[in-house]
């Protein structure tokens, strides 16, 4: 039976179910604002004005009590400790969700303990329930702070490369038995070296750890970051749940992870050569991380040939039963060795970034994706070219995201890579199922990007998309793809895009050469009884329309100067969409 109690507030009796606060009712709609509660609590109400409050009224009451210790005949003393604790808990939860700055949510309990001695006692009797913690930065006087508060868990946060106050961080780290969270962000040498030296002892209470090293020139690969020694954290992290290393070399990381069996989030990014560890060592530690939900593993640059020897398959299967998000950046050979023994039955987001290779051979990646239960045939695909890479995203293949990106600059390399990944790096049932294909670029694409690309290379890259009905071309790619379509018209018009029905062009005012090229392709498809309709595509307004709602201007093939195509001798009866 749930425990109930009754307490009096200015003549208004409320009955609250402590063990089921969601069952509290209010016979008044809409819910009064906190300002209204302030007025109500200051005067008597008729007995028939029974008001039963939803859960967050507790927060409103607490806010009123924080405004003043007494309001009329209402004081904090009328509330039992259990009710105060419920309100404190909810108040701190709301503070955590609404705080704009990280320390504010950690230190919200300071407000409560300064109201009165009774509130202070209630708060400090339940430090675990209220998740009380002390927050230290380089500007926090550690000794004075520790002297005035109970022995609560410690959070250490250092952001930036300020030289002042480093002694405070080091002094806080020396309380290793109480430190529950450490974030050292954008810290340069030798300050990071000094902090790492202090962290060689065990931190038994540590649940979150983030270290990001900041070099002097972020555009250049730098191998001067201090190497984390094998004795880091005493070689054990039994309570660690969140680990984030960015640009920090730690070759002994897999050994530490063997003890971190409660790990939920693992982010290891921008690994320099000095921090390399083998895929086999990574598989060994991953096999113990059965609670892992998010895994990021990324290398700063291609792995030297020294580490690219052929490897035997890992003898033990590794199942990550809770993993939902995997992101990788590195060599394709490394990923192949890593994924071969791994299964992730709940995976719903997969992002892969490869450094360029002439031949990209990824059979293990194909098998890994194929045995992922959440995988399904996508409806659309996005091919995006940038100054540094080409990527293919299949939004509907997984509940989250499926992305494969090749990191390279020359446009010819990008086209060759696109052809390879679309034909061999995805399971065979994915790319051929795509019905809507978007080809676009980013703002940093160089103007001379396509100078060395032949039409045959474009045809090879687009050939796997056999089911595409709708082709969307961004402004920059309209002229680039147009000549390829023109070549199709002169040879085998259905060799590529045999199912194509609609072309959406973001560029509205086409040059005569581009109009002729697209027009020849449209006319050639008309001759084989596979008509193509050309539309203007406003990518900014795309979300405002469903496919069936896109406006089309009649069947006239000859429009004014604002039309996408205006050559009646080429277009025949194809429809054109106006702006």
Residue ranges and their predicted role:
Residues 1-579:
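Leucine-rich repeat
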């Amino acid at each position: 039976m749930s425990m109930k109690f009754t307490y009096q507030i200015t003549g208004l009796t409320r009955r609250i179910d402590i063990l089921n606060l969601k069952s509290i009712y209010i016979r008044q709609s809409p819910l009064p604002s906190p300002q209204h509660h302030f007025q109500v609590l200051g005067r008597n109400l008729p007995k028939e004005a029974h008001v039963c409050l939803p859960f967050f009224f507790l927060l409103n009451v607490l806010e009123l009590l924080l405004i003043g210790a007494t309001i009329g005949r209402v004081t904090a003393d009328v509330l039992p400790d259990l009710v105060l604790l419920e309100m404190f808990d909810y108040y701190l939860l709301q503070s955590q969700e609404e705080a704009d700055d990280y320390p504010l949510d950690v230190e919200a309990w300071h407000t409560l303990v300064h109201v009165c001695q009774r509130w202070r006692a209630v708060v400090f009797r339940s430090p675990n329930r209220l998740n009380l913690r002390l927050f230290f930065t380089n500007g926090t006087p550690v000794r004075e702070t520790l002297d005035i508060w109970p022995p609560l868990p410690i959070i250490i946060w250092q952001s930036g490369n300020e030289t002042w106050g480093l002694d405070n961080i080091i002094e806080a780290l020396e309380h290793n038995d109480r430190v529950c969270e450490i974030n050292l962000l954008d810290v340069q040498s030798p300050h990071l070296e000094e902090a790492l030296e202090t962290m060689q002892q065990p931190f038994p209470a540590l649940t979150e750890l983030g270290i990001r090293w900041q070099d002097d020139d972020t555009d250049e690969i730098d191998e001067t970051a201090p190497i984390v020694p094998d004795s880091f954290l005493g070689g054990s992290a039994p309570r660690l749940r969140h680990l984030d290393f960015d640009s920090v070399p730690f070759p002994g990381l897999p050994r530490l992870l063997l003890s971190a069996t409660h790990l939920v989030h693992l982010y290891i990014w921008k690994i320099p050569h000095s921090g390399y560890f083998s895929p086999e060592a990574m598989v060994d530690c991953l096999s113990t991380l059965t609670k892992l939900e998010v895994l990021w593993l990324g290398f700063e640059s291609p792995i030297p040939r020294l580490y690219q020897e052929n490897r035997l398959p890992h003898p033990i299967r590794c199942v990550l039963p809770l993993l939902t998000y995997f992101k990788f950046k590195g060599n394709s050979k490394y990923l192949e060795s890593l994924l071969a023994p791994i299964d992730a039955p709940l995976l719903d987001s997969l992002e892969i970034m490869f450094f360029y290779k002439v031949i990209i051979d990824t059979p293990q990646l194909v098998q890994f994706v194929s045995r992922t239960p959440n995988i399904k045939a996508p409806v659309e695909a996005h091919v995006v070219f940038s100054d540094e890479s080409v990527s293919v995203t299949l939004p509907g293949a997984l509940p989250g995201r499926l992305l494969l990106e090749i990191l390279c600059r020359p446009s010819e390399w990008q086209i060759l890579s696109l052809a390879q990944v679309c034909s061999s790096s995805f399971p065979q049932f994915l790319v051929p199922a795509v019905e809507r294909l978007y080809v676009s670029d980013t703002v940093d694409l160089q103007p001379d990007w396509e100078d060395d690309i032949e039409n045959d290379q474009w045809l090879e890259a687009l050939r796997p998309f056999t089911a595409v009905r709708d082709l969307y071309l961004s402004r920059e790619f309209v002229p680039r793809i147009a000549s390829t379509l023109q070549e199709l018209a002169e040879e085998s018009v259905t060799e590529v895009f045999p199912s194509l029905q609609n072309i959406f062009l973001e560029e509205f005012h086409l040059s005569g050469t581009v109009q002729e090229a697209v027009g020849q392709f449209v006319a050639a498809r008309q001759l084989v009884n596979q008509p193509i309709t050309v539309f203007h595509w406003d990518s900014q307004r795309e979300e405002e329309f469903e496919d069936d709602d896109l406006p089309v201007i009649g069947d006239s093939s000859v429009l004014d100067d604002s039309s996408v195509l205006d050559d009646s001798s080429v277009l025949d009866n194809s429809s054109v969409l106006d702006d």
